[in-house]
Protein backbone atom coordinates (compact mmCIF):
# COMPACT_ATOMS: atom_id res chain seq x y z
CA UNK A 1 0.00 0.00 0.00
CA UNK A 2 1.11 3.53 -0.63
CA UNK A 3 0.12 6.72 0.98
CA UNK A 4 -1.50 8.74 -1.75
CA UNK A 5 -0.32 12.30 -1.81
CA UNK A 6 1.82 11.73 1.27
CA UNK A 7 4.02 14.67 2.06
CA UNK A 8 2.29 17.04 -0.35
CA UNK A 9 -0.14 19.74 0.78
CA UNK A 10 -3.54 19.09 -0.82
CA UNK A 11 -4.32 21.34 -3.74
CA UNK A 12 -7.41 23.51 -3.44
CA UNK A 13 -8.22 22.52 -6.99
CA UNK A 14 -8.20 18.85 -5.99
CA UNK A 15 -10.51 19.63 -3.06
CA UNK A 16 -12.81 21.51 -5.44
CA UNK A 17 -12.69 18.60 -7.88
CA UNK A 18 -13.58 16.18 -5.08
CA UNK A 19 -16.71 18.23 -4.37
CA UNK A 20 -17.86 17.74 -7.95
CA UNK A 21 -17.16 14.03 -8.23
CA UNK A 22 -16.89 12.41 -4.81
CA UNK A 23 -19.68 14.17 -2.94
CA UNK A 24 -22.39 14.58 -5.57
CA UNK A 25 -24.49 11.65 -4.33
CA UNK A 26 -24.06 12.39 -0.61
CA UNK A 27 -24.64 16.08 -1.26
CA UNK A 28 -28.02 15.62 -2.95
CA UNK A 29 -29.44 13.32 -0.24
CA UNK A 30 -31.08 16.26 1.64
CA UNK A 31 -33.49 16.54 -1.29
CA UNK A 32 -35.36 13.42 -0.17
CA UNK A 33 -33.76 11.62 2.82
CA UNK A 34 -35.24 13.47 5.83
CA UNK A 35 -38.61 14.02 4.16
CA UNK A 36 -38.93 10.31 3.41
CA UNK A 37 -38.82 9.42 7.12
CA UNK A 38 -42.27 11.00 7.53
CA UNK A 39 -43.73 9.16 4.56
CA UNK A 40 -47.23 7.92 5.58
CA UNK A 41 -45.99 4.39 4.84
CA UNK A 42 -43.89 4.50 8.03
CA UNK A 43 -46.74 5.79 10.23
CA UNK A 44 -44.37 8.06 12.16
CA UNK A 45 -46.09 10.99 13.86
CA UNK A 46 -44.54 14.43 13.43
CA UNK A 47 -43.69 15.09 17.09
CA UNK A 48 -40.66 16.88 18.57
CA UNK A 49 -39.34 13.61 20.06
CA UNK A 50 -39.59 11.80 16.70
CA UNK A 51 -37.99 14.72 14.85
CA UNK A 52 -35.09 14.82 17.31
CA UNK A 53 -34.76 11.04 17.12
CA UNK A 54 -34.64 10.84 13.32
CA UNK A 55 -32.20 13.75 13.10
CA UNK A 56 -30.00 12.16 15.75
CA UNK A 57 -29.87 8.91 13.77
CA UNK A 58 -28.98 10.78 10.55
CA UNK A 59 -26.31 12.97 12.17
CA UNK A 60 -24.65 10.14 14.07
CA UNK A 61 -24.91 7.96 10.97
CA UNK A 62 -22.88 10.63 9.15
CA UNK A 63 -20.35 10.51 11.99
CA UNK A 64 -20.01 6.72 12.06
CA UNK A 65 -20.10 5.79 8.35
CA UNK A 66 -18.66 8.58 6.16
CA UNK A 67 -16.50 10.12 8.90
CA UNK A 68 -15.24 7.19 10.97
CA UNK A 69 -15.37 4.31 8.50
CA UNK A 70 -14.40 6.02 5.27
CA UNK A 71 -12.58 9.30 6.02
CA UNK A 72 -10.67 7.93 9.02
CA UNK A 73 -9.94 4.28 8.22
CA UNK A 74 -10.96 3.06 4.74
CA UNK A 75 -8.86 5.68 2.95
CA UNK A 76 -5.80 4.03 4.49
CA UNK A 77 -6.55 0.79 2.61
CA UNK A 78 -5.37 1.97 -0.81
CA UNK A 79 -4.14 -0.38 -3.51
CA UNK A 80 -1.26 1.61 -4.98
CA UNK A 81 -3.29 4.79 -4.43
CA UNK A 82 -6.58 3.35 -5.72
CA UNK A 83 -9.75 2.55 -3.77
CA UNK A 84 -13.08 0.90 -4.48
CA UNK A 85 -14.44 -2.62 -4.38
CA UNK A 86 -12.26 -4.15 -7.15
CA UNK A 87 -8.98 -2.53 -5.99
CA UNK A 88 -9.81 -3.60 -2.42
CA UNK A 89 -10.53 -7.16 -3.54
CA UNK A 90 -7.30 -7.22 -5.55
CA UNK A 91 -5.39 -5.86 -2.53
CA UNK A 92 -6.72 -8.62 -0.27
CA UNK A 93 -6.01 -11.36 -2.84
CA UNK A 94 -2.47 -10.16 -3.59
CA UNK A 95 -1.20 -9.09 -0.16
CA UNK A 96 -2.86 -11.53 2.25
CA UNK A 97 -2.17 -15.25 2.34
CA UNK A 98 -5.57 -16.88 2.32
CA UNK A 99 -6.75 -20.43 1.85
CA UNK A 100 -8.49 -21.25 -1.43
CA UNK A 101 -11.77 -21.31 0.51
CA UNK A 102 -11.29 -17.75 1.78
CA UNK A 103 -10.05 -16.54 -1.61
CA UNK A 104 -13.31 -17.75 -3.15
CA UNK A 105 -15.22 -15.91 -0.44
CA UNK A 106 -13.33 -12.68 -1.09
CA UNK A 107 -14.06 -12.97 -4.82
CA UNK A 108 -17.75 -13.54 -4.05
CA UNK A 109 -17.71 -10.47 -1.75
CA UNK A 110 -16.14 -8.41 -4.52
CA UNK A 111 -18.59 -9.56 -7.18
CA UNK A 112 -21.58 -8.90 -4.91
CA UNK A 113 -20.27 -5.40 -4.17
CA UNK A 114 -19.68 -4.70 -7.86
CA UNK A 115 -23.12 -6.03 -8.83
CA UNK A 116 -24.80 -3.83 -6.22
CA UNK A 117 -22.82 -0.82 -7.46
CA UNK A 118 -24.33 -1.27 -10.92
CA UNK A 119 -27.78 -1.37 -9.32
CA UNK A 120 -27.01 1.89 -7.55
CA UNK A 121 -25.79 3.36 -10.87
CA UNK A 122 -29.30 3.07 -12.28
CA UNK A 123 -31.20 4.33 -9.22
CA UNK A 124 -29.08 7.40 -8.39
CA UNK A 125 -29.76 9.34 -11.64
CA UNK A 126 -33.48 8.51 -11.49
CA UNK A 127 -34.18 9.46 -7.86
CA UNK A 128 -31.82 12.45 -7.82
CA UNK A 129 -33.14 14.23 -10.92
CA UNK A 130 -36.76 13.37 -10.07
CA UNK A 131 -36.41 14.85 -6.58
CA UNK A 132 -34.91 18.06 -7.99
CA UNK A 133 -37.58 18.59 -10.65
CA UNK A 134 -40.33 17.90 -8.11
CA UNK A 135 -39.38 21.21 -6.52
CA UNK A 136 -41.43 22.89 -9.25
CA UNK A 137 -44.56 21.70 -7.44
CA UNK A 138 -43.74 24.14 -4.64
CA UNK A 139 -44.24 26.97 -7.15
CA UNK A 140 -47.42 25.47 -8.56
CA UNK A 141 -48.99 22.02 -8.04
CA UNK A 142 -50.03 22.07 -11.72
CA UNK A 143 -46.35 21.83 -12.68
CA UNK A 144 -46.27 18.33 -11.20
CA UNK A 145 -47.42 16.86 -14.52
CA UNK A 146 -44.15 18.08 -16.07
CA UNK A 147 -41.93 16.25 -13.59
CA UNK A 148 -41.51 12.98 -15.50
CA UNK A 149 -41.17 14.52 -19.02
CA UNK A 150 -38.56 17.04 -17.82
CA UNK A 151 -36.68 14.31 -15.96
CA UNK A 152 -36.62 12.14 -19.08
CA UNK A 153 -35.33 15.02 -21.24
CA UNK A 154 -32.56 15.84 -18.76
CA UNK A 155 -31.47 12.21 -18.39
CA UNK A 156 -31.49 11.56 -22.15
CA UNK A 157 -29.36 14.68 -22.63
CA UNK A 158 -26.96 13.59 -19.88
CA UNK A 159 -26.38 10.13 -21.35
CA UNK A 160 -26.34 11.42 -24.93
CA UNK A 161 -23.36 13.69 -24.22
CA UNK A 162 -21.30 11.00 -22.49
CA UNK A 163 -19.39 10.17 -25.68
CA UNK A 164 -17.93 13.68 -25.71
CA UNK A 165 -16.27 13.15 -22.35
CA UNK A 166 -16.56 15.20 -19.19
CA UNK A 167 -13.21 16.97 -19.03
CA UNK A 168 -14.42 20.40 -20.11
CA UNK A 169 -17.78 20.19 -18.35
CA UNK A 170 -16.08 18.66 -15.32
CA UNK A 171 -14.13 21.85 -14.74
CA UNK A 172 -17.34 23.57 -13.61
CA UNK A 173 -18.61 20.65 -11.50
CA UNK A 174 -16.52 21.67 -8.49
CA UNK A 175 -17.62 25.33 -8.37
CA UNK A 176 -21.29 24.36 -8.83
CA UNK A 177 -21.09 21.83 -5.99
CA UNK A 178 -19.27 24.39 -3.82
CA UNK A 179 -22.21 26.75 -4.38
CA UNK A 180 -24.60 23.86 -3.65
CA UNK A 181 -23.01 23.01 -0.31
CA UNK A 182 -22.86 26.67 0.70
CA UNK A 183 -26.58 26.91 -0.14
CA UNK A 184 -27.31 23.80 1.94
CA UNK A 185 -25.54 25.28 4.94
CA UNK A 186 -27.14 28.71 4.55
CA UNK A 187 -30.71 27.38 4.23
CA UNK A 188 -30.23 25.19 7.27
CA UNK A 189 -28.62 27.89 9.40
CA UNK A 190 -31.49 30.34 8.83
CA UNK A 191 -34.04 27.91 10.25
CA UNK A 192 -31.79 26.75 13.09
CA UNK A 193 -31.68 30.35 14.34
CA UNK A 194 -35.48 30.49 14.14
CA UNK A 195 -35.86 27.24 16.12
CA UNK A 196 -32.63 26.69 18.12
CA UNK A 197 -34.17 23.89 20.19
CA UNK A 198 -33.52 21.64 17.19
CA UNK A 199 -29.91 21.41 18.42
CA UNK A 200 -31.22 18.90 20.97
CA UNK A 201 -30.96 16.40 18.12
CA UNK A 202 -27.16 16.44 18.50
CA UNK A 203 -27.67 14.31 21.61
CA UNK A 204 -27.51 10.62 20.55
CA UNK A 205 -29.91 9.74 23.36
CA UNK A 206 -32.81 10.95 21.19
CA UNK A 207 -31.94 8.30 18.62
CA UNK A 208 -31.81 5.61 21.30
CA UNK A 209 -35.10 6.83 22.74
CA UNK A 210 -36.72 6.57 19.31
CA UNK A 211 -35.90 2.85 19.30
CA UNK A 212 -37.72 2.42 22.60
CA UNK A 213 -40.73 4.54 21.65
CA UNK A 214 -41.17 3.09 18.13
CA UNK A 215 -40.06 -0.56 18.41
CA UNK A 216 -42.30 -1.68 15.56
CA UNK A 217 -40.87 0.94 13.20
CA UNK A 218 -37.18 0.82 14.16
CA UNK A 219 -35.87 -1.17 11.20
CA UNK A 220 -38.20 0.55 8.73
CA UNK A 221 -36.76 3.87 9.91
CA UNK A 222 -33.18 2.61 9.62
CA UNK A 223 -33.97 1.65 6.04
CA UNK A 224 -34.88 5.28 5.42
CA UNK A 225 -32.02 6.83 7.40
CA UNK A 226 -29.56 5.01 5.11
CA UNK A 227 -30.74 7.36 2.32
CA UNK A 228 -28.75 10.12 4.03
CA UNK A 229 -25.59 7.99 3.77
CA UNK A 230 -25.82 6.93 0.12
CA UNK A 231 -22.75 8.08 -1.74
CA UNK A 232 -20.35 7.51 1.15
CA UNK A 233 -18.71 4.65 -0.77
CA UNK A 234 -17.54 7.20 -3.37
CA UNK A 235 -15.18 8.66 -0.76
CA UNK A 236 -13.22 5.41 -1.02
CA UNK A 237 -13.89 4.53 -4.66
CA UNK A 238 -12.64 7.89 -6.01
CA UNK A 239 -9.48 8.01 -3.91
CA UNK A 240 -7.31 7.33 -6.96
CA UNK A 241 -8.58 10.44 -8.73
CA UNK A 242 -7.99 12.99 -5.97
CA UNK A 243 -5.88 11.48 -3.20
CA UNK A 244 -6.60 10.97 0.47
CA UNK A 245 -6.12 14.47 1.87
CA UNK A 246 -8.33 16.41 -0.58
CA UNK A 247 -11.19 13.97 0.03
CA UNK A 248 -10.78 14.15 3.80
CA UNK A 249 -10.46 17.92 3.99
CA UNK A 250 -13.40 18.53 1.64
CA UNK A 251 -15.49 16.34 3.94
CA UNK A 252 -14.42 17.90 7.23
CA UNK A 253 -14.32 21.53 6.10
CA UNK A 254 -17.41 21.82 3.92
CA UNK A 255 -19.47 18.73 3.10
CA UNK A 256 -20.13 17.37 6.60
CA UNK A 257 -20.92 20.79 8.15
CA UNK A 258 -23.20 21.72 5.23
CA UNK A 259 -25.12 18.43 5.41
CA UNK A 260 -25.47 18.61 9.20
CA UNK A 261 -26.71 22.21 9.07
CA UNK A 262 -29.23 21.45 6.33
CA UNK A 263 -30.69 18.40 8.07
CA UNK A 264 -30.96 20.39 11.31
CA UNK A 265 -32.61 23.21 9.35
CA UNK A 266 -35.16 20.81 7.87
CA UNK A 267 -35.86 19.52 11.36
CA UNK A 268 -36.29 23.08 12.66
CA UNK A 269 -38.71 23.90 9.83
CA UNK A 270 -40.88 20.84 10.38
CA UNK A 271 -40.77 21.47 14.13
CA UNK A 272 -42.34 24.86 13.44
CA UNK A 273 -44.63 23.65 10.61
CA UNK A 274 -45.58 20.02 11.46
CA UNK A 275 -47.84 19.61 8.42
CA UNK A 276 -45.26 20.84 5.89
CA UNK A 277 -43.63 17.47 5.17
CA UNK A 278 -44.12 17.54 1.39
CA UNK A 279 -41.15 18.88 -0.65
CA UNK A 280 -39.58 19.83 2.66
CA UNK A 281 -36.20 20.82 1.24
CA UNK A 282 -37.63 23.43 -1.14
CA UNK A 283 -39.84 24.89 1.57
CA UNK A 284 -36.69 26.00 3.40
CA UNK A 285 -36.16 28.65 0.72
CA UNK A 286 -38.05 31.95 0.34
CA UNK A 287 -40.67 31.80 -2.42
CA UNK A 288 -38.68 34.10 -4.73
CA UNK A 289 -35.69 31.73 -4.64
CA UNK A 290 -37.49 28.43 -5.25
CA UNK A 291 -36.99 28.47 -9.04
CA UNK A 292 -33.24 29.28 -8.81
CA UNK A 293 -32.97 26.56 -6.15
CA UNK A 294 -34.71 24.05 -8.45
CA UNK A 295 -32.21 24.93 -11.20
CA UNK A 296 -29.24 24.63 -8.82
CA UNK A 297 -30.52 21.34 -7.38
CA UNK A 298 -31.05 19.98 -10.90
CA UNK A 299 -27.45 20.83 -11.77
CA UNK A 300 -26.29 19.19 -8.54
CA UNK A 301 -28.25 16.01 -9.27
CA UNK A 302 -26.93 15.88 -12.83
CA UNK A 303 -23.41 16.14 -11.41
CA UNK A 304 -24.19 13.38 -8.90
CA UNK A 305 -25.52 11.25 -11.75
CA UNK A 306 -22.44 11.96 -13.86
CA UNK A 307 -20.17 10.80 -11.04
CA UNK A 308 -22.08 7.51 -10.81
CA UNK A 309 -22.03 7.00 -14.59
CA UNK A 310 -18.27 7.65 -14.75
CA UNK A 311 -17.87 5.24 -11.85
CA UNK A 312 -19.76 2.56 -13.80
CA UNK A 313 -17.39 3.06 -16.76
CA UNK A 314 -14.32 2.74 -14.51
CA UNK A 315 -15.77 -0.30 -12.73
CA UNK A 316 -16.48 -1.98 -16.07
CA UNK A 317 -12.98 -1.30 -17.42
CA UNK A 318 -11.44 -2.80 -14.26
CA UNK A 319 -13.78 -5.82 -14.44
CA UNK A 320 -12.73 -6.46 -18.05
CA UNK A 321 -9.02 -6.32 -17.19
CA UNK A 322 -9.46 -8.55 -14.12
CA UNK A 323 -11.35 -11.13 -16.18
CA UNK A 324 -14.89 -10.68 -14.85
CA UNK A 325 -16.44 -9.27 -18.03
CA UNK A 326 -15.84 -9.85 -21.75
CA UNK A 327 -14.02 -7.27 -23.84
CA UNK A 328 -16.19 -4.24 -24.60
CA UNK A 329 -15.50 -1.22 -26.75
CA UNK A 330 -13.79 1.43 -24.61
CA UNK A 331 -13.26 4.93 -26.00
CA UNK A 332 -10.73 7.25 -24.35
CA UNK A 333 -12.38 10.68 -24.43
CA UNK A 334 -9.33 12.66 -23.32
CA UNK A 335 -5.78 11.91 -24.53
CA UNK A 336 -4.29 13.69 -21.52
CA UNK A 337 -6.46 11.99 -18.88
CA UNK A 338 -6.52 8.26 -19.64
CA UNK A 339 -9.07 7.68 -16.88
CA UNK A 340 -11.66 9.61 -18.91
CA UNK A 341 -13.36 6.77 -20.77
CA UNK A 342 -16.68 6.02 -22.42
CA UNK A 343 -18.17 2.54 -22.86
CA UNK A 344 -21.12 2.74 -25.30
CA UNK A 345 -22.89 -0.50 -24.35
CA UNK A 346 -22.82 0.35 -20.62
CA UNK A 347 -24.00 3.90 -21.33
CA UNK A 348 -27.06 2.86 -23.33
CA UNK A 349 -27.97 -0.02 -20.99
CA UNK A 350 -27.87 2.41 -18.06
CA UNK A 351 -30.01 4.96 -19.95
CA UNK A 352 -32.70 2.42 -20.86
CA UNK A 353 -32.80 1.10 -17.28
CA UNK A 354 -32.91 4.58 -15.73
CA UNK A 355 -35.74 5.69 -18.03
CA UNK A 356 -37.72 2.55 -17.21
CA UNK A 357 -37.30 3.32 -13.50
CA UNK A 358 -38.45 6.92 -13.94
CA UNK A 359 -41.50 5.97 -15.98
CA UNK A 360 -42.39 3.07 -13.67
CA UNK A 361 -42.01 4.73 -10.25
CA UNK A 362 -42.68 8.36 -11.42
CA UNK A 363 -41.97 9.89 -7.96
CA UNK A 364 -38.81 10.09 -5.89
CA UNK A 365 -40.78 8.95 -2.84
CA UNK A 366 -41.75 5.76 -4.69
CA UNK A 367 -38.13 5.16 -5.73
CA UNK A 368 -36.91 5.63 -2.15
CA UNK A 369 -38.05 2.08 -1.41
CA UNK A 370 -35.68 0.77 -4.08
CA UNK A 371 -32.80 2.98 -3.02
CA UNK A 372 -30.40 2.20 -0.22
CA UNK A 373 -30.34 -1.61 -0.36
CA UNK A 374 -27.73 -1.77 -3.13
CA UNK A 375 -25.53 0.82 -1.42
CA UNK A 376 -25.95 -0.89 1.95
CA UNK A 377 -24.83 -4.27 0.59
CA UNK A 378 -21.75 -2.65 -0.98
CA UNK A 379 -20.94 -1.04 2.39
CA UNK A 380 -21.17 -4.40 4.18
CA UNK A 381 -18.93 -6.08 1.58
CA UNK A 382 -16.36 -3.28 1.92
CA UNK A 383 -16.38 -3.63 5.71
CA UNK A 384 -15.83 -7.40 5.52
CA UNK A 385 -12.81 -6.91 3.25
CA UNK A 386 -11.49 -4.08 5.44
CA UNK A 387 -11.63 -6.38 8.47
CA UNK A 388 -9.19 -8.69 6.64
CA UNK A 389 -6.96 -5.73 5.78
CA UNK A 390 -7.01 -4.45 9.37
CA UNK A 391 -6.17 -7.88 10.78
CA UNK A 392 -3.49 -9.02 8.32
CA UNK A 393 -1.94 -5.82 6.93
CA UNK A 394 -2.44 -3.28 9.70
CA UNK A 395 -1.84 -5.93 12.38
CA UNK A 396 -4.81 -4.85 14.49
CA UNK A 397 -5.66 -6.95 17.51
CA UNK A 398 -8.96 -8.78 17.87
CA UNK A 399 -9.97 -6.21 20.51
CA UNK A 400 -9.29 -3.27 18.15
CA UNK A 401 -11.19 -4.93 15.33
CA UNK A 402 -14.12 -5.66 17.64
CA UNK A 403 -14.28 -2.09 18.93
CA UNK A 404 -14.15 -0.47 15.49
CA UNK A 405 -14.99 -2.79 12.62
CA UNK A 406 -17.37 -5.21 14.28
CA UNK A 407 -19.27 -2.24 15.73
CA UNK A 408 -19.52 -0.67 12.26
CA UNK A 409 -20.54 -4.03 10.77
CA UNK A 410 -23.33 -4.45 13.34
CA UNK A 411 -24.65 -0.96 12.52
CA UNK A 412 -24.54 -1.66 8.77
CA UNK A 413 -26.30 -5.00 9.21
CA UNK A 414 -29.02 -3.21 11.21
CA UNK A 415 -29.39 -0.82 8.26
CA UNK A 416 -29.45 -3.86 5.96
CA UNK A 417 -32.32 -5.44 7.91
CA UNK A 418 -34.20 -2.16 7.59
CA UNK A 419 -33.59 -2.11 3.86
CA UNK A 420 -34.68 -5.73 3.53
CA UNK A 421 -38.09 -4.71 4.89
CA UNK A 422 -38.42 -2.42 1.86
CA UNK A 423 -38.17 -5.30 -0.62
CA UNK A 424 -41.96 -5.39 -1.28
CA UNK A 425 -41.95 -1.59 -1.81
CA UNK A 426 -39.26 -1.43 -4.50
CA UNK A 427 -36.30 -2.96 -2.70
CA UNK A 428 -36.70 -6.01 -4.94
CA UNK A 429 -35.34 -4.02 -7.88
CA UNK A 430 -31.66 -3.63 -6.85
CA UNK A 431 -31.63 -7.27 -5.73
CA UNK A 432 -32.99 -8.41 -9.11
CA UNK A 433 -30.72 -6.12 -11.12
CA UNK A 434 -27.69 -6.92 -8.97
CA UNK A 435 -28.50 -10.63 -9.17
CA UNK A 436 -28.42 -10.51 -12.98
CA UNK A 437 -25.11 -8.60 -12.96
CA UNK A 438 -23.63 -11.02 -10.40
CA UNK A 439 -24.70 -13.94 -12.58
CA UNK A 440 -23.00 -12.39 -15.62
CA UNK A 441 -19.78 -11.59 -13.72
CA UNK A 442 -19.62 -15.04 -12.13
CA UNK A 443 -20.55 -16.88 -15.32
CA UNK A 444 -17.89 -15.11 -17.35
CA UNK A 445 -15.23 -15.80 -14.72
CA UNK A 446 -16.19 -19.45 -14.35
CA UNK A 447 -16.47 -19.87 -18.11
CA UNK A 448 -13.00 -18.42 -18.63
CA UNK A 449 -11.55 -20.91 -16.15
CA UNK A 450 -13.32 -23.78 -17.94
CA UNK A 451 -12.17 -22.52 -21.34
CA UNK A 452 -8.55 -22.32 -20.21
CA UNK A 453 -8.73 -25.87 -18.89
CA UNK A 454 -9.96 -27.05 -22.31
CA UNK A 455 -7.24 -25.08 -24.10
CA UNK A 456 -4.56 -26.53 -21.81
CA UNK A 457 -5.82 -30.05 -22.48
CA UNK A 458 -5.74 -29.42 -26.23
CA UNK A 459 -2.31 -27.82 -25.92
CA UNK A 460 -0.82 -30.74 -23.99
CA UNK A 461 -0.91 -32.87 -27.16
CA UNK A 462 1.65 -30.69 -28.90
CA UNK A 463 5.27 -29.64 -28.41
CA UNK A 464 7.09 -26.94 -30.34
CA UNK A 465 9.90 -29.24 -31.43
CA UNK A 466 7.50 -31.83 -32.83
CA UNK A 467 5.45 -29.19 -34.63
CA UNK A 468 8.52 -27.62 -36.22
CA UNK A 469 10.01 -30.97 -37.27
CA UNK A 470 7.22 -31.67 -39.74
CA UNK A 471 8.68 -30.00 -42.82
CA UNK A 472 7.76 -26.40 -42.11
CA UNK A 473 8.80 -23.76 -44.64
CA UNK A 474 10.36 -20.50 -43.37
CA UNK A 475 8.87 -17.34 -44.87
CA UNK A 476 9.99 -13.72 -44.45
CA UNK A 477 8.17 -11.37 -42.12
CA UNK A 478 7.01 -11.15 -38.53
CA UNK A 479 4.13 -13.11 -37.01
CA UNK A 480 2.61 -12.27 -33.63
CA UNK A 481 0.45 -14.89 -31.90
CA UNK A 482 -1.54 -14.26 -28.73
CA UNK A 483 -1.31 -16.86 -25.97
CA UNK A 484 -4.05 -17.08 -23.29
CA UNK A 485 -1.51 -18.42 -20.75
CA UNK A 486 2.27 -18.14 -20.28
CA UNK A 487 4.32 -21.07 -21.67
CA UNK A 488 1.35 -22.15 -23.74
CA UNK A 489 1.53 -22.67 -27.48
CA UNK A 490 -1.17 -20.44 -29.04
CA UNK A 491 -3.79 -22.55 -30.80
CA UNK A 492 -3.76 -20.02 -33.64
CA UNK A 493 -0.05 -20.89 -34.13
CA UNK A 494 -0.86 -24.61 -34.22
CA UNK A 495 -3.70 -24.00 -36.68
CA UNK A 496 -1.43 -21.92 -38.91
CA UNK A 497 1.25 -24.64 -38.97
CA UNK A 498 -1.24 -27.42 -39.64
CA UNK A 499 -3.05 -25.61 -42.45
CA UNK A 500 -0.39 -23.38 -44.03
CA UNK A 501 2.82 -25.28 -43.08
CA UNK A 502 4.86 -22.07 -42.77
CA UNK A 503 6.87 -20.39 -40.02
CA UNK A 504 7.76 -16.72 -40.21
CA UNK A 505 11.38 -15.65 -39.80
CA UNK A 506 10.47 -13.80 -36.61
CA UNK A 507 7.69 -15.46 -34.62
CA UNK A 508 6.47 -13.92 -31.38
CA UNK A 509 4.18 -15.38 -28.73
CA UNK A 510 2.69 -12.67 -26.55
CA UNK A 511 0.67 -13.17 -23.37
CA UNK A 512 -1.29 -10.28 -21.84
CA UNK A 513 -1.48 -10.54 -18.05
CA UNK A 514 -3.22 -8.32 -15.49
CA UNK A 515 -1.70 -7.67 -12.07
CA UNK A 516 -3.71 -7.12 -8.88
CA UNK A 517 -2.51 -3.52 -8.98
CA UNK A 518 -4.14 -0.51 -10.66
CA UNK A 519 -0.91 0.49 -12.42
CA UNK A 520 2.32 -1.32 -13.26
CA UNK A 521 5.39 0.84 -14.09
CA UNK A 522 6.52 0.56 -17.70
CA UNK A 523 9.90 -0.75 -16.56
CA UNK A 524 8.19 -3.73 -14.90
CA UNK A 525 5.60 -4.58 -17.54
CA UNK A 526 7.70 -6.72 -19.86
CA UNK A 527 9.39 -10.07 -19.47
CA UNK A 528 10.72 -11.90 -22.51
CA UNK A 529 12.90 -14.79 -23.60
CA UNK A 530 13.97 -16.67 -26.70
CA UNK A 531 13.00 -20.35 -26.83
CA UNK A 532 15.44 -23.03 -27.95
CA UNK A 533 13.66 -23.15 -31.33
CA UNK A 534 14.13 -19.43 -31.96
CA UNK A 535 10.62 -18.23 -31.07
CA UNK A 536 10.29 -15.12 -28.91
CA UNK A 537 7.99 -15.27 -25.90
CA UNK A 538 6.77 -11.99 -24.38
CA UNK A 539 4.63 -11.45 -21.28
CA UNK A 540 3.09 -7.98 -21.03
CA UNK A 541 1.76 -7.37 -17.50
CA UNK A 542 -0.34 -4.25 -16.96
CA UNK A 543 -2.46 -2.97 -14.09
CA UNK A 544 -6.23 -3.19 -14.09
CA UNK A 545 -6.40 0.58 -14.71
CA UNK A 546 -3.80 0.43 -17.51
CA UNK A 547 -4.44 -0.16 -21.19
CA UNK A 548 -1.81 -2.51 -22.66
CA UNK A 549 0.29 -0.84 -25.35
CA UNK A 550 1.27 -3.60 -27.78
CA UNK A 551 3.17 -1.31 -30.12
CA UNK A 552 5.34 0.02 -27.28
CA UNK A 553 5.91 -3.54 -26.02
CA UNK A 554 7.12 -4.72 -29.42
CA UNK A 555 9.37 -1.68 -29.83
CA UNK A 556 10.90 -2.32 -26.40
CA UNK A 557 11.51 -5.98 -27.21
CA UNK A 558 13.01 -5.00 -30.55
CA UNK A 559 15.72 -3.05 -28.74
CA UNK A 560 16.26 -5.61 -25.97
CA UNK A 561 16.36 -8.73 -28.17
CA UNK A 562 17.78 -7.15 -31.34
CA UNK A 563 14.65 -8.08 -33.22
CA UNK A 564 14.82 -6.87 -36.85
CA UNK A 565 11.27 -5.53 -36.89
CA UNK A 566 11.78 -2.39 -38.96
CA UNK A 567 10.89 -2.60 -42.60
CA UNK A 568 9.42 -6.09 -42.39
CA UNK A 569 5.75 -6.98 -42.85
CA UNK A 570 4.06 -7.85 -39.55
CA UNK A 571 0.97 -10.01 -39.18
CA UNK A 572 -1.14 -10.57 -36.07
CA UNK A 573 -2.66 -14.05 -35.91
CA UNK A 574 -5.81 -14.25 -33.79
CA UNK A 575 -7.82 -17.30 -32.85
CA UNK A 576 -11.53 -16.64 -33.24
CA UNK A 577 -13.00 -19.22 -30.92
CA UNK A 578 -16.53 -20.55 -31.24
CA UNK A 579 -17.78 -21.87 -27.91
CA UNK A 580 -19.87 -25.04 -28.09
CA UNK A 581 -21.84 -25.64 -24.85
CA UNK A 582 -22.09 -29.28 -23.75
CA UNK A 583 -23.59 -31.12 -20.79
CA UNK A 584 -20.14 -32.00 -19.43
CA UNK A 585 -19.25 -31.11 -15.84
CA UNK A 586 -17.76 -27.82 -14.75
CA UNK A 587 -20.71 -25.47 -15.13
CA UNK A 588 -24.46 -25.74 -15.60
CA UNK A 589 -25.60 -25.95 -19.21
CA UNK A 590 -27.58 -22.69 -19.07
CA UNK A 591 -24.48 -20.89 -17.76
CA UNK A 592 -22.47 -22.33 -20.65
CA UNK A 593 -25.08 -20.98 -23.06
CA UNK A 594 -24.83 -17.53 -21.41
CA UNK A 595 -21.02 -17.70 -21.51
CA UNK A 596 -21.08 -18.63 -25.21
CA UNK A 597 -23.40 -15.69 -25.89
CA UNK A 598 -21.14 -13.29 -23.97
CA UNK A 599 -18.08 -14.64 -25.77
CA UNK A 600 -19.76 -14.27 -29.16
CA UNK A 601 -20.73 -10.66 -28.45
CA UNK A 602 -17.41 -9.52 -26.95
CA UNK A 603 -15.50 -6.94 -28.93
CA UNK A 604 -12.99 -8.61 -31.20
CA UNK A 605 -9.31 -8.34 -30.31
CA UNK A 606 -8.57 -6.33 -33.46
CA UNK A 607 -10.72 -3.42 -32.31
CA UNK A 608 -10.01 -3.75 -28.58
CA UNK A 609 -6.22 -3.64 -28.98
CA UNK A 610 -6.36 -1.16 -31.88
CA UNK A 611 -4.59 -3.53 -34.25
CA UNK A 612 -4.33 -2.51 -37.93
CA UNK A 613 -7.06 -4.63 -39.53
CA UNK A 614 -5.11 -5.11 -42.77
CA UNK A 615 -2.38 -6.90 -40.78
CA UNK A 616 -4.71 -9.24 -38.88
CA UNK A 617 -5.25 -12.90 -39.79
CA UNK A 618 -8.08 -14.70 -37.99
CA UNK A 619 -8.20 -18.47 -37.64
CA UNK A 620 -11.44 -20.14 -36.56
CA UNK A 621 -11.31 -22.59 -33.66
CA UNK A 622 -14.19 -24.52 -32.10
CA UNK A 623 -13.93 -25.29 -28.39
CA UNK A 624 -16.37 -27.53 -26.51
CA UNK A 625 -16.92 -26.73 -22.84
From Swiss-Prot:
Record's bilayer topology term: Multi-pass membrane protein
PANTHER family reported in the protein's UniProt record: LOW AFFINITY POTASSIUM TRANSPORT SYSTEM PROTEIN KUP, OSMOTIC STRESS POTASSIUM TRANSPORTER
MF GO annotations: potassium ion transmembrane transporter activity; symporter activity
Family classification: Belongs to the HAK/KUP transporter (TC 2.A.72) family.
Function summary: Transport of potassium into the cell. Likely operates as a K(+):H(+) symporter.
The entry's keywords: Cell inner membrane, Cell membrane, Ion transport, Membrane, Potassium, Potassium transport, Symport, Transmembrane, Transmembrane helix, Transport
Pfam hit, one: K_trans_C
Membrane spanning residue stretches: 14-34, 45-65, 107-127, 141-161, 173-193, 216-236, 251-271, 293-313, 341-361, 370-390, 398-418, 423-443
Reactions performed catalytically: K(+)(in) + H(+)(in) = K(+)(out) + H(+)(out)
Principal subcellular localization: membrane
One cellular component term from this protein's GO annotations in UniProt: plasma membrane
Lineage: Bacteria, Bacillati, Cyanobacteriota, Cyanophyceae, Acaryochloridales
Name the record gives this protein: Probable potassium transport system protein Kup
Localization terms from the record: Cell inner membrane
